[in-house]
Amino acid sequence: MALLQISEPGQSPDPHQRRVAIGIDLGTTHSLVAAVRNGVAECLPDAQGRVLLPSVVRYLGGGGRQIGYEAAAAQMQDPANTVSSVKRFMGRGLGDITGREKLPYNFIAATDSGGMLSLSTAAGVKSPVEVSAEILATLRYRAEDSFDSDLYGAVITVPAYFDDAQRQATKDAAHLAGLNLLRLINEPTAAAIAYGLDNGAEGVYAVYDLGGGTFDISVLRLAQGVFEVIATGGDSALGGDDYDAALAEWVMQQTGVRASTPEDKTAVRLAARACKEALTATDNVAFTADVAGATVQFDVKREDFAAVTADLTQRSLAAVRRTLRDAQIERDEVKGVVLVGGSTRMPVVRTAVAEFFGREPLTNLNPDEVVAIGAAIQANQLAGNDAAGDLLLLDVIPLSLGIETMGGLVERIIGRNETIPTAKAQDFTTYKDGQTALAIHVVQGERDLVQDCRSLARFELRGIPPMAAGAARIRVTFTVDADGLLSVAAREQASGVEARIDVKPSYGLTDEQIARMLQEGFATAQQDMQTRALVEARVDADRLLIATQSALDVDGDVLTAAERTAIDDLMHALRATLETSTDAAAVEAAAQALAKGTEAFAAQRMNRGIRQALAGKNVSAL
């Protein structure tokens, strides 16, 4: 009798059959697809041998569309229907798009409050998810043609600073493109995979990732196949596009020319990008653009470009400083700096990074391709093709997650820079006697007060059995999956009643909000501690007043008139302190006075309870 065979978990049942899995770098300016072929990760070219796909989609009347190079070539004559840098709009509301008046698109605000924006095109209204799906589908077809096979799945990279809404929008785009999404991974992590495996690197590394629309800085520890992200930071609205815009605005100021039409704005922006790219190889370039029916020409020196964009470069270095502080790493402990993203080709950026870290950055892998290559390596392993692979990814979440407690305080469940995937639980209880429902308010941020953090979601746990205040035990569990998406569950331990929610906020944080939340978290730490102490003292005092009044209502008759008056006076004093004082110590002192003043009353209540329990019983019965 033949023995039945059982395959290893996660591996292909047929040892000779390889699943085709791809890695996709869905970029702001360009996108790429890569795969492992014959043991080597490589970017897949199109029929013309080009590995880069411009992240541009042009919509035509009658439902037609152009994607990639053909669409990019049409930006000048049809800017309103040619969508580029759509990554900046993923998971965003209309109010989040800074400088949208300079863009040639007809934006449409969401019908629901805080929803994701859309764009009006010749082919109808299109969401950023739909536009991104067109790009992903094009890369999918390229990979299928390259392997002449269906795909098992894909790993797609996202900026480390993408929040829940932006990550969910990316997942939706992958689904719309017909891709089986194996994992979302952070772009710096993908770059570290490529460098770690190709070069056998170990130690602490910084990944400086400046793309077309986003900037990420990650500090990683690489050791024996384990890639641990110690800390992440960045700016979700800083990239090569901003360097283009700064140069274009400066040239317009110098020449006195105004770009007012969508066509003129697009012409100036494309000319600025061409000028920026040319300055990578030469010290002096002529800026040339047709604006308002005339040709604008202006000589731009490399030092001019450096001066005009100095604020942008310093913004990136400020994020680097914050992230190193989070990681508790000094600059001289960083063994190497990996440059990722086409924008790191700019000499002004390379020079600034080298001066900051005191060492030349690593550039031996193509900065345009390194993220896609790392994603392909991870996809190959998730598909079960690399049985010997022992790669372990330890990504982190960028901002703390918690819930609101009494007094508007934030109780953190998962701290920022916590390794994901992760699940953490904490027990809470009710505030009032007979409370049968609990409102769960999920927030994100580094401050101690709910009003200073960002609201993510609200839900209710109902059906809690009526109990005395503090008797119920409600376990709240936060789960963050490998893609960085959050789900929250609340369960009352005695009855088993449970409620849960997948947190999918309608749109994401702006770059200003991200920077403010982190900076204020550091700048106001002492103030937050004092405020938290006051709020906690107030909550405890309120709870003591409620409990004391409840006890008086039930057993107040055991007190003499003088004893009752003394307790009433102490309660009045505590209420007066709560109304007038902002000193936590004063509130605590008044509460302690009431607690001490009711000790005899508590003993009398206990004696009464014992007498009632023993009434009518003899010693033998006991």
From Swiss-Prot:
Listed Pfam families: HSP70 (PF00012)
Transmembrane segments: none
GO BP terms: iron-sulfur cluster assembly
Alphabetical list of PROSITE patterns matching this protein: HSP70_1, HSP70_2, HSP70_3
Protein keywords: ATP-binding, Chaperone, Nucleotide-binding
Gene Ontology MF terms in the entry: ATP binding; ATP hydrolysis activity; ATP-dependent protein folding chaperone; unfolded protein binding
Chaperone among keywords: yes
PANTHER family found in the cross-reference section: HEAT SHOCK PROTEIN 70KDA
Function according to Swiss-Prot or TrEMBL: Chaperone involved in the maturation of iron-sulfur cluster-containing proteins. Has a low intrinsic ATPase activity which is markedly stimulated by HscB.
Assigned protein family: Belongs to the heat shock protein 70 family.
Protein name: Chaperone protein HscA homolog
Originating organism: Acidovorax sp. (strain JS42)
Phylogenetic lineage: Bacteria, Pseudomonadati, Pseudomonadota, Betaproteobacteria, Burkholderiales
Gene responsible for this protein: hscA
